[in-house]
């Protein structure tokens, strides 16, 4: 028998969108800001998500 295929990993943007849908805009924005704080840099993806998480 074959094993089930592995689930695809979510992109960062998809993860933020899911948080936005589940917990709301404020949570998604805080999640995005903390990601940049934890990696000690502001990446372009984080800025895109921060600007778009409330859309």
UniProtKB/Swiss-Prot annotation:
Family recorded in the similarity comment: Belongs to the CYSTM1 family.
Subcellular location, principal: membrane
Assigned keywords, A-Z: Cell membrane, Cell wall, Membrane, Metal-binding, Secreted, Stress response, Transmembrane, Transmembrane helix
Gene: CDT1
Name this polypeptide is given: Protein CADMIUM TOLERANCE 1
Location in or out of the cell: Cell membrane; Secreted, Cell wall
Membrane topology of the entry: Single-pass membrane protein
InterPro entries, per database record: CYSTM1_HM_Tolerance (IPR051671), CYSTM_dom (IPR028144)
Function, as annotated: Confers resistance to heavy metal ions (e.g. cadmium (CdCl(2)) and copper (CuCl(2))) by chelating them at the plasma membrane of root cells, thus stopping their entry and reducing their accumulation. Binds to aluminium (Al).
Transmembrane segments: 24-40
Gene Ontology BP annotations: cellular detoxification; detoxification of cadmium ion; detoxification of copper ion
GO CC terms: extracellular region; plant-type cell wall; plasma membrane
């Amino acid at each position: 028998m074959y094993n089930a295929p592995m689930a695809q990993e979510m992109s960062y943007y998809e993860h933020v969108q899911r948080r936005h849908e589940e917990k709301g805009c404020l949570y998604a924005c805080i999640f995005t800001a903390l990601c940049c704080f934890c990696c000690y840099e502001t990446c372009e993806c984080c800025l895109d998500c921060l600007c778009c998480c409330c859309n």
